[in-house]
Amino acid sequence: MEELERIERPSASEGERRAAEWLVGRFAELGAEARIEAEPAHGTYWWPLGIGATLGAIGGILSLRGRRVLGGALAGAAAAGMASDYPPGKRLLRRALPRRTTYNVVCELGPATAERTVVAIAHHDAAHSGLVFHPKLPEIADRLGMIERTDTSPPLMAPVVGGPVLAALGAFTGRRLLTKLGVVLGIGSAAAMAEIGMREVVPGANDNGTAVVSLLALAEQLIEQPPESLRVILLSVGSEESFSEGMKAFGERHFPTLTRESTFFLCLESTGSPHLLVLRGEGFLKMREYPARALALMDGLAEELDVWLYPNLRTRSGTDGLESMAAGYETAVIASCTDLKQPANYHWWHDLAENVDFGTVADGIRLSEATIRRLDERWL
């Protein structure tokens, strides 16, 4: 993990490519063959969201100056484009933006002709920081009693689309106050996105070096004791931090050959906080509940292993598991949290290997292996 965190690896970058090559080499040391699948990706989220927020603010200003139809149409189009940019949407706004290359690492173990497949997912890129991720913010929310009252994380990114929405509503209804609020929120959101874009990349030990080393541990165990009737794909995607572009590309390439009835996706995301958990649901704008059968499997295995799971948490963001769940696959996400129901050191400079709870990482590996072994014995 310390080797990986020393690689500066923003989404769709040369550093991400080096991280992918490093991971392929580590798989090879274990005796597992892995390959890199290069895919087109934009590599940010702050540009499409920032542009959308700016267009929404411009639409609001046009409306306030008497051009309500044009302003409302511009703000509405910006809102629709921004909404599509959140996973698992079609990412319409970024299609007009420059594209780079992202690098997915794929390692296949077990019988190649197996009828059933488990895909274990990590990601090897790392995030930009930003003031919106300041660790003091959850502490303030906790002092205000906001953390205890809810089991769903705050929608950090959803308000960004709120500016264009309010500007459009104000334009079409003639309510100038709504329009003014939309303009202010749009300008503020654009500024926040610009600030994130100017920040450097965090070390990314918990998010998501913990999952990468978990894949390596799983590879070692599966080589030592191969599954009998199950193909296992150990997948580390790039560009997760630019709204799961690597996972979306994997889906476009591989979902047509992975049948929904015989494929299980197991996403590992930031498993180095004090408390292990299995997400109940997630989504930036729309909360999507994870499949009941997948959750029952994970909860039952955790009980058998005597692994305590932090109960009933949902997140108003998106892991790579959101893509496979939205595509109709049985999916589960193993993650972790602090007492404040947040990933430890999330998108901050303290996200170092020295601050990772390796006991939680080990429990996540145990639960992941148990899931694979159980599905090898019998399917859902």
Please report, for each region that a protein language model flagged, where it lies by residue.
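Acidic/histidine-rich catalytic neighborhood of metal-dependent amide-processing enzymes
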Residues: 84-106, 113-114, 126-131, 170-183, ...
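Short, conserved micro-motifs enriched in small and acidic residues
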Residues: 14-18, 202-213, 358-362
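Hydrophobic anchor at the start of a short beta-strand
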Residues: 33-34, 232, 263, 309, ...
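Short beta-strand element of the alpha/beta-hydrolase
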Residues: 117-122
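Active-site-adjacent substrate-binding region
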Residues: 38, 271-380
